[in-house]
Amino acid sequence: MAKVTFVRTKPHMNVGTIGQIDHGKTTLTAAITKYCSFFGWADYTPYEMIDKAPEERARGITINITHVEYQTEKRHYAHIDCPGHADYIKNMITGAAQMDGAILVLAATDGPMPQTREHVLLARQVNVPAMIVFINKVDMVDPELVDLVEMEVRDLLSKYEFPGDEVPVVRGSALKAIEAPNDPNDPAYKPIKELLDAMDTYFPDPVREVDKPFLMPIEDVFSITGRGTVVTGRIERGVIKPGVEAEIIGMSYEIKKTVITSVEMFRKELDEAIAGDNVGCLLRGSSKDEVERGQVLAKPGSITPLKKFKANIYVLKKEEGGRHTPFTKGYKPQFYIRTADVTGEIVDLPAGVEMVMPGDNVEMTIELIYPVAIEKGMRFAVREGGRTVGAGVVSEIIE
């Protein structure tokens, strides 16, 4: 079949396979690319290619991730697959590869397992908007057992606040699709087609960063004689235009109001700047000593300064450059939250957890020495003595 030139005309979406090791995530990923290749929508990426995932670094942590891409009638998908359980945990916590939708792969032979639960919980905490279930290996068990597994997984999803009754559940065998002849009408591909149709219809279109309320972490502050105070940084989300009101948030509970009188990029004045742009904003009525690195410039009322929150933290192993010893309640590292570098204390650990070992992933309560702009699902790094010792994601706001 002739190669089709790739033109990005379809909406783009990031997805990924999650679930217990050996339940068939990588085989399913390969099967999707095989089926899509019949229509010129993908290059077939075999299991072996996906399995030897290249290393990537995110927030000082090394993660193995494979990216494949494919299209359907409706969308262009970038799909991630991680070989090891720890890689999934690290990816979800650092946000190295964001997921707008997740495909939970579950073997009919096992049903939900500990890693299945851990991945679903993390998907909830990092705000993965939607999930679809693929029950794999259905050729190896009785249909009654598959019904039971489906009931179990729907209960599990409901427990973690996903709409368990509405989530599409597709049943099939990824391996059978890999082994089937190259004919898209072969019955072995029916579940793969069903899964892609479910992704197209059930996964909502991602909210683009540009459509969210304006926020820019402040990287640098300087004053220009006769003009006022300029703050620089990369716009994280939203759009900004000159003449608009904004709030300066962080370092104290006081929220300072200001007006952005001009927006510049590469020494040129702009009518508007959007998410991803590196800009300088001239602030009216703010003196240089009122603004500092670590604060954020944001749309009024969109974010509040906080000191106390719960977060899921992955603690690096010694081999990853992390700590050699465990830590307990009362541990005080540095938290790198956007551009802020602030000391905080681990004030609480889950019931029954006395100490946190390198390599653990634990939800803990953190209290910072001063408030910064924080929201659920936000990523940060934990550092001590100039090295990264952990990566975290905010799971709950306390105060």
From Swiss-Prot:
<feature type="domain" description="tr-type G">
    <location>
        <begin position="10"/>
        <end position="207"/>
    </location>
</feature>
<keyword id="KW-0342">GTP-binding</keyword>
<feature type="binding site">
    <location>
        <begin position="136"/>
        <end position="139"/>
    </location>
    <ligand>
        <name>GTP</name>
    </ligand>
</feature>
<protein>
    <recommendedName>
        <fullName>Elongation factor Tu</fullName>
        <ecNumber>3.6.5.3</ecNumber>
    </recommendedName>
</protein>
<keyword id="KW-0479">Metal-binding</keyword>
<dbReference type="InterPro" id="IPR000795">
    <property type="entry name" value="T_Tr_GTP-bd_dom"/>
</dbReference>
<dbReference type="InterPro" id="IPR004541">
    <property type="entry name" value="Transl_elong_EFTu/EF1A_bac/org"/>
</dbReference>
<dbReference type="InterPro" id="IPR009001">
    <property type="entry name" value="Transl_elong_EF1A/Init_IF2_C"/>
</dbReference>
<dbReference type="InterPro" id="IPR031157">
    <property type="entry name" value="G_TR_CS"/>
</dbReference>
<keyword id="KW-0963">Cytoplasm</keyword>
<comment type="function">
    <text>GTP hydrolase that promotes the GTP-dependent binding of aminoacyl-tRNA to the A-site of ribosomes during protein biosynthesis.</text>
</comment>
<dbReference type="GO" id="GO:0003746">
    <property type="term" value="F:translation elongation factor activity"/>
</dbReference>
<dbReference type="InterPro" id="IPR005225">
    <property type="entry name" value="Small_GTP-bd"/>
</dbReference>
<dbReference type="GO" id="GO:0005525">
    <property type="term" value="F:GTP binding"/>
</dbReference>
<feature type="region of interest" description="G3">
    <location>
        <begin position="81"/>
        <end position="84"/>
    </location>
</feature>
<feature type="region of interest" description="G4">
    <location>
        <begin position="136"/>
        <end position="139"/>
    </location>
</feature>
<feature type="region of interest" description="G2">
    <location>
        <begin position="60"/>
        <end position="64"/>
    </location>
</feature>
<feature type="binding site">
    <location>
        <position position="26"/>
    </location>
    <ligand>
        <name>Mg(2+)</name>
    </ligand>
</feature>
<dbReference type="GO" id="GO:0003924">
    <property type="term" value="F:GTPase activity"/>
</dbReference>
<comment type="subunit">
    <text>Monomer.</text>
</comment>
<dbReference type="InterPro" id="IPR009000">
    <property type="entry name" value="Transl_B-barrel_sf"/>
</dbReference>
<feature type="binding site">
    <location>
        <begin position="81"/>
        <end position="85"/>
    </location>
    <ligand>
        <name>GTP</name>
    </ligand>
</feature>
<dbReference type="InterPro" id="IPR004160">
    <property type="entry name" value="Transl_elong_EFTu/EF1A_C"/>
</dbReference>
<dbReference type="Pfam" id="PF03144">
    <property type="entry name" value="GTP_EFTU_D2"/>
</dbReference>
<dbReference type="InterPro" id="IPR004161">
    <property type="entry name" value="EFTu-like_2"/>
</dbReference>
<dbReference type="InterPro" id="IPR041709">
    <property type="entry name" value="EF-Tu_GTP-bd"/>
</dbReference>
<keyword id="KW-0547">Nucleotide-binding</keyword>
<keyword id="KW-0460">Magnesium</keyword>
<dbReference type="InterPro" id="IPR033720">
    <property type="entry name" value="EFTU_2"/>
</dbReference>
<keyword id="KW-0378">Hydrolase</keyword>
<feature type="binding site">
    <location>
        <begin position="19"/>
        <end position="26"/>
    </location>
    <ligand>
        <name>GTP</name>
    </ligand>
</feature>
<dbReference type="Pfam" id="PF03143">
    <property type="entry name" value="GTP_EFTU_D3"/>
</dbReference>
<dbReference type="Pfam" id="PF00009">
    <property type="entry name" value="GTP_EFTU"/>
</dbReference>
<dbReference type="InterPro" id="IPR027417">
    <property type="entry name" value="P-loop_NTPase"/>
</dbReference>
<feature type="region of interest" description="G5">
    <location>
        <begin position="173"/>
        <end position="175"/>
    </location>
</feature>
<keyword id="KW-0648">Protein biosynthesis</keyword>
<feature type="region of interest" description="G1">
    <location>
        <begin position="19"/>
        <end position="26"/>
    </location>
</feature>
<comment type="similarity">
    <text>Belongs to the TRAFAC class translation factor GTPase superfamily. Classic translation factor GTPase family. EF-Tu/EF-1A subfamily.</text>
</comment>
<dbReference type="GO" id="GO:0005829">
    <property type="term" value="C:cytosol"/>
</dbReference>
<dbReference type="InterPro" id="IPR050055">
    <property type="entry name" value="EF-Tu_GTPase"/>
</dbReference>
<keyword id="KW-0251">Elongation factor</keyword>
